[in-house]
């Protein structure tokens, strides 16, 4: 039906007859001529209709925005005075000979001249995707996945599919369950990741695997998360953690060079402990120059118990955040920051303005200055490298509250005061995570997942001191986003059983949930390691949006709903009966749908 795409026409096509298919982006009548901007997936070109071609001209008078049309015409060079440098096709236009109105359009429920609500955009997603900026993001996504496949193929990785219907295994989030009609009362689970299957592929001898795969997690959503998401999943045998990181860093560096023309350079490597200490986050945004400085040792003996209490508590922390030029902040702004850190459990935010660095106590302004001696103040100013015109913020509480609150404050202040270097890239690797962390019930949970190997520990040593164990794990972080994470896996049965035991999984539960894995580990399992990238998040970064829904064709809302199809919906009662499932409404509700499905 077409010979060319609208957005690909240029001066090399002048004089040629072309047939185009697409949509009317805009129509205007000027001096007896009808002009339209015609759009397809590759861009927009100007088409004009002359009364000398009567049939086409009369039809063109009927055109409205978003009519689907086909035109045939001759490519002409625009006069110099009419060249549109804002369009890739701005040097040419099409003199239309024939017009075929393929399909008419009703007035759109989305207004291209104003900002539409996200709910409206998601409800009419097929129309929202016609917008050039949305189409460009999906085209970029296609190019990115194509590049990844070429890279992985060139480096000897095999693209192998793993099952979508599998067994529920604890991986940190709730599973999406699928009932079995054949096996009454039993359920499949949609995979949270292909983790165990890719490990089994290593045991099968496929020493370099990758897959661009859908994953599913029933968890509370944020702007950068979806219930179904896409991973670039990778696993290797006979490669160390350093070697895996080297290949994956090469992939990302070449991807940035290909898509952005940017050389990211070698990625710095930072331990988890250093990242938390300096930046209050295990995914630090290094574009932001602000850092936390521990000052507990300097305030242990001050009379201000808000400081001295945590400073003398092994589980406490006192940290300062120096903000260059921050002395200009108003009291109202400072109070707002105090309210902000309260979100993270902080009971307040102490502050100190350095008006004159050389004047000691006389040169600072702060409600806490009266509790500080000249010696303590000078030690704090030296430790934080404070200068005249700066402000210091202090967090003092438990280690977790201070780290979380001051880390979040660091990011907010960096944005508010325009200290964060927007338009730049700051990648790094974070390594040496704790193997375990405390859970809400007083036990331990795996910080990554229960198949991660510890660094330099035997099963006996791990069982004796699990909270001291360091995981052989690594995360790739770019501009404060964790874009990928991986680890060296456990490849011996005894170590895997030890980890399960530390996590409170009984031997019977181990056999029930992971018997197939424990059996496989007995048969010459090679050492193996891997990593998974969040494709959606990578595309989000590369296309310059901060909303992951912008890079997914048909995303869900933060309530895990599809406004376009109205999913999830109530099931047909006959289908539920066939599955031997009964849906019961909660007490106190009058859910008609649930009653229908009982």
Swiss-Prot record:
<feature type="binding site">
    <location>
        <position position="217"/>
    </location>
    <ligand>
        <name>L-aspartate</name>
    </ligand>
</feature>
<dbReference type="InterPro" id="IPR012340">
    <property type="entry name" value="NA-bd_OB-fold"/>
</dbReference>
<keyword id="KW-0067">ATP-binding</keyword>
<protein>
    <recommendedName>
        <fullName>Aspartate--tRNA ligase</fullName>
        <ecNumber>6.1.1.12</ecNumber>
    </recommendedName>
</protein>
<dbReference type="InterPro" id="IPR004364">
    <property type="entry name" value="Aa-tRNA-synt_II"/>
</dbReference>
<dbReference type="GO" id="GO:0005524">
    <property type="term" value="F:ATP binding"/>
</dbReference>
<comment type="similarity">
    <text>Belongs to the class-II aminoacyl-tRNA synthetase family. Type 1 subfamily.</text>
</comment>
<feature type="binding site">
    <location>
        <position position="226"/>
    </location>
    <ligand>
        <name>ATP</name>
    </ligand>
</feature>
<dbReference type="InterPro" id="IPR004115">
    <property type="entry name" value="GAD-like_sf"/>
</dbReference>
<dbReference type="InterPro" id="IPR029351">
    <property type="entry name" value="GAD_dom"/>
</dbReference>
<feature type="binding site">
    <location>
        <position position="171"/>
    </location>
    <ligand>
        <name>L-aspartate</name>
    </ligand>
</feature>
<dbReference type="InterPro" id="IPR006195">
    <property type="entry name" value="aa-tRNA-synth_II"/>
</dbReference>
<dbReference type="InterPro" id="IPR045864">
    <property type="entry name" value="aa-tRNA-synth_II/BPL/LPL"/>
</dbReference>
<dbReference type="Pfam" id="PF02938">
    <property type="entry name" value="GAD"/>
</dbReference>
<feature type="binding site">
    <location>
        <position position="489"/>
    </location>
    <ligand>
        <name>L-aspartate</name>
    </ligand>
</feature>
<keyword id="KW-0648">Protein biosynthesis</keyword>
<feature type="binding site">
    <location>
        <position position="482"/>
    </location>
    <ligand>
        <name>ATP</name>
    </ligand>
</feature>
<dbReference type="Pfam" id="PF00152">
    <property type="entry name" value="tRNA-synt_2"/>
</dbReference>
<dbReference type="InterPro" id="IPR047090">
    <property type="entry name" value="AspRS_core"/>
</dbReference>
<dbReference type="GO" id="GO:0006422">
    <property type="term" value="P:aspartyl-tRNA aminoacylation"/>
</dbReference>
<comment type="function">
    <text>Catalyzes the attachment of L-aspartate to tRNA(Asp) in a two-step reaction: L-aspartate is first activated by ATP to form Asp-AMP and then transferred to the acceptor end of tRNA(Asp).</text>
</comment>
<dbReference type="InterPro" id="IPR047089">
    <property type="entry name" value="Asp-tRNA-ligase_1_N"/>
</dbReference>
<feature type="binding site">
    <location>
        <begin position="217"/>
        <end position="219"/>
    </location>
    <ligand>
        <name>ATP</name>
    </ligand>
</feature>
<keyword id="KW-0547">Nucleotide-binding</keyword>
<feature type="binding site">
    <location>
        <position position="448"/>
    </location>
    <ligand>
        <name>L-aspartate</name>
    </ligand>
</feature>
<dbReference type="GO" id="GO:0005737">
    <property type="term" value="C:cytoplasm"/>
</dbReference>
<dbReference type="Pfam" id="PF01336">
    <property type="entry name" value="tRNA_anti-codon"/>
</dbReference>
<comment type="subunit">
    <text>Homodimer.</text>
</comment>
<dbReference type="InterPro" id="IPR004524">
    <property type="entry name" value="Asp-tRNA-ligase_1"/>
</dbReference>
<dbReference type="InterPro" id="IPR004365">
    <property type="entry name" value="NA-bd_OB_tRNA"/>
</dbReference>
<feature type="binding site">
    <location>
        <begin position="534"/>
        <end position="537"/>
    </location>
    <ligand>
        <name>ATP</name>
    </ligand>
</feature>
<feature type="region of interest" description="Aspartate">
    <location>
        <begin position="195"/>
        <end position="198"/>
    </location>
</feature>
<keyword id="KW-0030">Aminoacyl-tRNA synthetase</keyword>
<dbReference type="InterPro" id="IPR002312">
    <property type="entry name" value="Asp/Asn-tRNA-synth_IIb"/>
</dbReference>
<dbReference type="GO" id="GO:0004815">
    <property type="term" value="F:aspartate-tRNA ligase activity"/>
</dbReference>
<keyword id="KW-0963">Cytoplasm</keyword>
<keyword id="KW-0436">Ligase</keyword>
<dbReference type="GO" id="GO:0003676">
    <property type="term" value="F:nucleic acid binding"/>
</dbReference>
